[in-house]
Amino acid sequence: MNFANFPRPSDPAPLWQGAGEPSTAGISAAPSAELAPKPRLPRPTTAPTQEAPAGLRFDFNDGCRVMLPDAGRAWRVRLSDRQTGNVLFDVDLRSGHVNSAKRYFVPFRLEVWSDDERVLRHDYDARGRDVLIQFPVGTIGDVIGWFSYAVKFKDVHQCRLTCAMGEPLIALFRSAYPDITFVTHEMVEADRFYATYSVALFFDDAEFVYQPCDFRQVGLHRTAAYILGVDPAEQPPFVALADDSRPIAEPYVCISVQATTQCKHWNNPEGWDRTVAFCDEFCSLIQHLPGANGEADRQPAAVNIAE
């Protein structure tokens, strides 16, 4: 659990260290725009988005966050997990903010007292509220594998769901899911959301801040289910393309030669030459199968390597 003073408007903006870079720091000075790396995922707002009595503010956009104004009296804040009944955090402070240690889905209960009077009790409830689920850009298969779990989250919580992802992928899903709003990272309006969840691969999350379990143990696609707290059973997403016709009229073979990590590369020095030779030979054999008439629609095209 992290707690610190919220910055005044004149203070430097806090440095949010992005998914995959868990931090226990409270507030840090932001580097210059020239030096600051582009965040892997959109940042949450500095202050929580939801208003509450007595000048309190809270939200679930980076775990559970609550801001406590300096009202000349002590506050007591308690965070609980309603599913397990465990008290996660219970502290007294005069002002500042409290941020849960876990940033994945937890059914939080937030309680705040002032001078022994409880001024806020809020149970997480996304029904009818705006929720953002954000995915990294630059990957296709991962997001396709994760997206159906975002749909499950929407169905379970009956929220107004916005999904942030790479623009090329939006075209796959938008028509198939008209009840979900799709945006690019640049289009995210962070101050709209009651809750935000980041679905990605967190390689260095040793403290399990952004994921409840290591994706290498539960499976790359199922990690989304555990981050979002939904049933991990597989459910392929629907896709709807404006033009789903064949890009090439003849039968063809696709071979990809790129990968996101070295361990996925095929480093066999003769591998591609042998693969292409085999495919060319296979295409030639098909033309001589019984029933083949030599027409264009029966003849496989030459094998192309997709760069």
Walk through the language-model features, giving the residues of each.
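Catalytic machinery of carbohydrate-active enzymes
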Residues: N2-E307
